[in-house]
């Protein structure tokens, strides 16, 4: 009986740990993330969408190029990008465009001079 109780508890914990990933999204919000936006905007353009449900299946409503539009979803790795305390003296080309361009757990993050692969912030 004790073994069955422990197995049931283990199964509930395993399922429960997945709930935030499934239920953490708003209704109609698709999985995946938005590609980074290169901002700043020089024009004011009307949004093409307000929420993911207005986009085709494989697309997500994201702020990109000065307005919200349906764009291909990108996979997003766990963790957040660390804050960059530096100031850019010489902008460089982006070394990545999305998290999947980076190896392992590294994320594609905005830095002072462009985007590059960084370890996620702790905490």
From Swiss-Prot:
Keywords in alphabetical order: Disulfide bond, Protease inhibitor, Repeat, Secreted, Serine protease inhibitor, Signal
Q: Does the keyword Metal-binding apply?
A: no
Q: Which SMART domains match?
A: WAP (SM00217)
Report the subcellular localization.
Secreted
Q: Name one GO molecular function term.
A: serine-type endopeptidase inhibitor activity
Per the record's keyword annotation, is Signal included, yes or no?
Answer: yes
Q: Please cite one Gene Ontology biological process associated with this protein.
A: antibacterial humoral response
Signal peptide range? 1-24
Q: Start and end of every WAP domain?
A: 27-73, 74-121
Disulphide-bridged cysteine pairs: 34-62, 41-66, 49-61, 55-70, 81-109, 88-113, 96-108, 102-117
Name the job this protein performs: Putative acid-stable proteinase inhibitor.
User: Which named protein is this?
Assistant: WAP four-disulfide core domain protein 5
Provide the gene name from the record: WFDC5
């Amino acid at each position: 009986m004790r073994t069955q109780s422990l197995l049931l508890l283990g199964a509930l914990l395993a399922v429960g740990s997945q709930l935030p990933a499934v239920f953490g999204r708003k209704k109609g919000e698709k999985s995946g993330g938005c590609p980074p936006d290169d901002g700043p905007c020089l024009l004011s353009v009307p949004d093409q969408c307000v929420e993911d449900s207005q986009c085709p299946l494989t697309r997500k409503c994201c702020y990109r190029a000065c307005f919200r539009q349906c764009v291909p979803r990108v996979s997003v790795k766990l963790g957040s990008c660390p804050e960059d305390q530096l100031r850019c003296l010489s902008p460089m080309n982006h070394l990545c465009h999305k998290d999947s361009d980076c190896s392992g757990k590294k994320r594609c993050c905005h830095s002072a001079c462009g985007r590059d692969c960084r370890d996620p912030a702790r905490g």
